[in-house]
Amino acid sequence: MRWMLRCTISISLLAASPAMAQEEPGALCRAAIRAEEAAAGIPPGLLQAIGRVESGRRDPATGRIAPWPWTINAEGRGHFFQTREEAIAAVRQLQAGGMRSIDVGCMQVNLAAHPNAFPSLEAAFDPVTNARYAARFLSELQATRRDWARSAGNYHSNTP
């Protein structure tokens, strides 16, 4: 009887593991932003709110507005992609056409204004790397302005 129970549990876990391994994209941004917000000492929810404004879309899995990791903004137009690979390919195509000012990822970091933010385009679309840079940048703004609200207001309209 115990053997049968163990087999049933093992089969159930094996069947569930692909679903568990494939976390929905909005959750990747939320978790990365929350962790980097705490690590940088940013008031809880502030970086998350900026992320929702910058790359928010209705998450198909939850119905909530959440930062979306596979987002780009080029010439004022936001584009949401289903995969990281699609987003990277779109940025490469835009760059090949001469466009340089492109916002990428959960926190919509501008590649022209922040040319040294990421070692590669792939890294720019990594939710943790993207959120980490955004947290550092917001913290730098706060250090000079001494005001979180003003710093948040300057997040997208200020260069490093």
Regions found by a protein language model. Give the residues of each.
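Catalytic glycan-binding domains that act on GlcNAc-containing polysaccharides
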Residues: Q22-P160
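N-terminal signal peptide c-region/cleavage motif recognized by signal peptidases
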Residues: A16-P18
